[in-house]
Amino acid sequence: MNTIALVTGAAGGLGQAVTHKLAQAGWQVVVVGRDGARLQQAFGGAHRQIVADCSTTAGVKALFATLKAEQLVPTALAHCIGNIRLGAAHRMAEKDFNNCLTANLVSAFHTLAGFTGQLRDAGSPGAAVFVSSAAARIGTPNHEAVAAAKAGLEGLVRGAAATYASAGIRVNAVAPGMMETPATAGMISSPTTREAATRQYPLPGIGDAAELAELMVWLLSPHGARVTGQVWSLDGGFSTIRPLVR
């Protein structure tokens, strides 16, 4: 059985957690990022490290050309690229909105295209998992840009799952609420903001990358063999329930 996994955005907090969980589970991991120095800092000499920009077709083509040249055919993809661009629509610059779409949706589309193309050429089944957000499912103030991008991502997941099911390729996503990672550090840097963030959730608290990574690795594993086209929430009930007001 081929147990090569590809992790994009690997130098980030979630990417590192997913890489660690995959390696623990016995996968050979290929880690990808735009900054080679950050990859080196995160992983030292561990794992095959490839510098590529997955937000462009050229970057994705270069990535999969490198994999092909090295006879590496990943059968699992954990796409951990994204950003959190907050702000009301009328205040957001066009550049910031475009960056949000590129990081959260465009990169996912191009990477999925490269991944599924290589699997189909190899005649191999596989699985991909992407990262959405609770904001795609419930209106949250100042989340217009990221909500639009992640809602598009969820549509991509369902469409691709339908397209590639007959080839044995599964496509899913996870949708966390607030997680404690370097990307969110500024939002919960004070006791006041941390307490406010914690109290939003029916199950109070802030998630961490290791929790989400555990679910992502499960979805990529044989245990998730009957799961495709799904978006799994890990948000303390934020997007689905309302507790009693006491």
Language model: regions and residue ranges:
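Alpha-helical segment proximal to the catalytic Tyr-Lys
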Residues: 117, 162-166, 225
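Short C-terminal tail/terminal secondary-structure segment
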Residues: 228-246
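Active-site helix of classical SDR
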Residues: 112, 149, 157
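Substrate-binding pocket helix/loop in short-chain dehydrogenase/reductase
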Residues: 88-89, 93-101, 197
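Residue(s) in the substrate-gating loop at a strand-loop-helix junction
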Residues: 133
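Conserved glycine-rich cofactor-binding loop
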Residues: 11-12
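C-terminal helical subdomain
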Residues: 173, 192-227, 234-236
